Design a protein with these regions (language model features):
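Residues lining hydrophobic/aromatic ligand-binding pockets adjacent to catalytic sites
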Residues: 1-237
Length: 237
């Protein structure tokens, strides 16, 4: 499976990670605006809110070279927004300080920031998925060496030529069975996108503002972890 890097990735991203022993992040793509590469979604008292971070516009296009812009106080604003949204969630206090420490450390690049955040949530949800990067565009670094993980290449011109498989999260009732259509490459880097329908059908879980807005699917994985804590792994699998 090949995915793009993502900032506080959505729940569907982690539900996909839970189904593979190894997942490759595309290290040879260009930065794409208005994507999960530098934005995430949380649920606040006012509804769904997008959190973004700015990048340095220095001509760098390769995703691993894009630098984070810390000239504005976006870290403080992000932490305030997360505090306000989740201070009353059951498990927020257990994760707050260690999570904010990542933001406060000011990783230089988008790739590093997202990588550290993804590694954090893998550890806290208990997933053992190994994350690797591609060696060329659409090419896993060690193609064929991971049993059960397909190694597929997808050229940019093919990105919209197929319908992504639909999976279901099971909410703790064991692994779902996924049956991708024949010929569908295991590459969802463009399918998981804020402006596209989710490739996952999320089971419901408790959310802080559920009585006000109903259940809101596919928020950042932080929403799941802060509300479900150690049980998050059961939901994802």
């Amino acid at each position: 499976m090949i995915l793009s890097t993502a900032y506080f990735p959505p729940v569907e991203y982690f539900a996909i990670l839970a189904r593979y022993s190894v997942v490759y992040l595309e290290a040879h793509e260009n930065y794409v605006k208005q994507s999960y590469r530098n934005r995430c979604r949380i649920l606040t008292a006012n509804g769904v809110e997008d959190l973004r971070f700015p990048i340095v516009h220095d001509g760098a296009k390769l995703i691993t070279e894009v630098k984070v812009d810390y000239k504005t106080p976006w870290v403080r604003q992000t932490e305030y927004a997360i505090d306000s949204a989740y201070y009353s969630s059951p498990f927020f206090e257990y994760y707050r300080d260690s999570l904010f420490a990542i933001l406060d450390s000011h990783p230089e690049t988008l790739w590093e920031l997202n990588g550290r955040i993804t590694a954090y949530f893998l550890a806290k949800t208990g997933l053992s998925t190994e994350i690797r990067s591609t060696s060329a565009f659409g090419v896993p670094a060690t193609a064929g060496s991971c049993p059960g993980v397909a190694s597929a290449s997808l050229h940019p011109s093919q990105a919209d030529a197929w319908a992504p498989p639909v999976y279901e999260t099971t909410g703790g009732h064991g692994p779902a069975v996924d049956t991708p259509s024949r010929g569908v490459p295991d590459n969802l880097r463009e399918a998981i996108h804020p402006k596209r329908e989710p490739v996952m059908k999320n089971a419901e879980y408790w959310q802080v503002f559920r009585e006000r807005f109903g259940f809101v699917p596919n928020l950042s994985v932080m929403d799941l972890l802060f509300n479900e804590g150690p049980e998050s792994i059961c939901y994802l699998r």
